[in-house]
Design a protein with these regions (language model features):
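Dinucleotide-binding Rossmann-like beta1-alpha1 core, especially the glycine-rich loop
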Residues: 71-149
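Central helical "cap/lid" subdomain
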Residues: 215-244
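Helical element adjacent to the flavin cofactor pocket in flavoenzyme catalytic cores
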Residues: 166-212, 219
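Glycine-rich FAD pyrophosphate-binding loop
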Residues: 48-66
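N-terminal Rossmann-like FAD-binding beta1-loop-alpha1 element of flavoenzymes
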Residues: 30-54
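N-terminal secretory signal peptides and thylakoid transit peptides that target proteins
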Residues: 1-13
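A short, basic/flexible loop-to-alpha-helix module at the beginning of a structural domain
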Residues: 15-26
């Protein structure tokens, strides 16, 4: 199973319910492994819901996959099939909410795409029509219209350019740090460098995690380790091969 297939399967499941307050007796202690953008978002939303949260990372915030990501927020034609595209649409909306909550600087300017190969260009046009049928505000514009949006780009020879107006861009490292800062302000603990090495159980109940910085009590563990799938296989016994 590759990363994109995994995301498609996740798209078939409902999104997490709205945040709710835990009572003191209910408050779980959750260990989030990985302080990248995904781990930081998980930590923020769990902290907001009232959970006790600890985040660990073997190097530091946004030091691996999140450091190299393009930062493109989109529900583009490449998000196939439709349930995966729907998940991406919800993700775009979630970024708008995060921006309001935490003042994360997101640039909402849309995106432009086109191909020099005529056959691929015709396929792009069909894909944009499909996007429109799925409720995405995307369309085909001329080179002149594209030049008005991006005057410093040479669109000579280009035609039928795809414009996805809902797309945005974010600095993933900055967004990660803002999310973690918000989490720690609500009581979350951030520890690095610290690496998960094993888990401890009382029968079938998880009670703690062994890390390179010591034992951490935990009721639940969330693995947000990006491309480092070896730890997922070791701890969760799930093999997630990666491909680029």
């Amino acid at each position: 199973m590759n990363r994109r297939t995994l995301l498609k399967l996740l798209a078939l499941t409902p999104l997490a319910p709205s945040a709710r307050e835990y009572t003191q007796s209910q408050q779980p202690h959750i260990l989030v492994v990985g302080a990248g953008l995904i781990g930081a978002s998980i930590a923020y939303h769990l902290s907001f819901a009232g959970a006790k949260v600890t985040v660990i990372d073997k190097q530091g915030p946004a030091s691996h996959a999140s450091l190299g990501t393009f930062g493109w927020i989109n529900a583009s034609y490449a998000k196939q099939p439709q349930h995966y595209h729907s998940l991406s649409q919800q993700s775009v909306e979630a970024w708008h909410q995060l921006q309001k909550q935490l003042n994360i600087p997101v640039k909402w300017g849309g995106s432009l795409e086109w191909f020099s190969d005529e056959a691929r260009q015709q396929k792009l046009i069909r894909q944009i029509v499909e996007q429109q049928n799925w409720g995405e505000p995307a369309g085909i514009i001329s080179a002149a219209q594209a030049s008005s949006l991006e005057p410093h780009v040479d669109f000579t020879g280009a035609s039928n350019i795809a414009f996805s107006e809902n797309d945005g861009a974010v600095d993933p490292v900055l967004a990660t740090r803002i999310l973690l800062q918000a989490s720690t302000s609500m009581g979350a603990q951030l520890i690095y460098p610290s690496e998960l090495s094993d888990t401890l159980y009382d029968g079938t109940r998880l009670v703690a995690a062994k890390t390179t910085t010591g034992r951490i009590m935990a009721d639940k563990i969330v693995l947000a380790t990006g491309a480092a799938t070896d730890i997922v296989k070791k701890i969760a016994k799930i093999d997630i091969p990666q491909r680029s």
